[in-house]
Amino acid sequence: MAKQSMKAREVKRVALADKYFAKRAELKAIISDVNASDEDRWNAVLKLQTLPRDSSPSRQRNRCRQTGRPHGYVGKFGLSRIKLREAAMRGEVPGLKKASW
């Protein structure tokens, strides 16, 4: 089980990424625009650097919804491999069954 502070930190990162998404996209568009002047591009880089570090989506980590475990995350279900197996064995995941051949 992950610490509550780690789970809260991830929630904070998601909220910050949502809040600054439009501004970050606008600045990145200016930076990647080849027709923009060098000065405009440089100013956009400086403004992008002033945004909060946690507002970047690449800072987010996928975590299990039940335990907060960061490793062994199965994105389709939002659970770690351990909790997914437990749920599947109890028959709580529709259409998922143990392989047998």
Swiss-Prot record:
Pfam families listed in its UniProt record: Ribosomal_S14
Gene3D superfamilies from the UniProt entry: 1.10.287.1480
Cysteine-cysteine disulfides: none
Q: RNA-binding: is it a keyword of this entry? A: yes
> Entry's PROSITE patterns?
RIBOSOMAL_S14
Q: What's in the keyword line of the UniProt record?
A: Ribonucleoprotein, Ribosomal protein, RNA-binding, rRNA-binding
* Gene Ontology MF, one: structural constituent of ribosome
A GO BP term here is:
translation
| Cellular component annotations (GO), alphabetically ordered | cytoplasm; small ribosomal subunit
Q: Which family does it belong to?
A: Belongs to the universal ribosomal protein uS14 family.
Q: How does it assemble?
A: Part of the 30S ribosomal subunit. Contacts proteins S3 and S10.
Provide the function of this protein.
Answer: Binds 16S rRNA, required for the assembly of 30S particles and may also be responsible for determining the conformation of the 16S rRNA at the A site.
What's this protein's name? Answer: Small ribosomal subunit protein uS14
Q: Which organism is it from?
A: Citrobacter koseri (strain ATCC BAA-895 / CDC 4225-83 / SGSC4696)
Q: What is the lineage of its organism?
A: Bacteria, Pseudomonadati, Pseudomonadota, Gammaproteobacteria, Enterobacterales
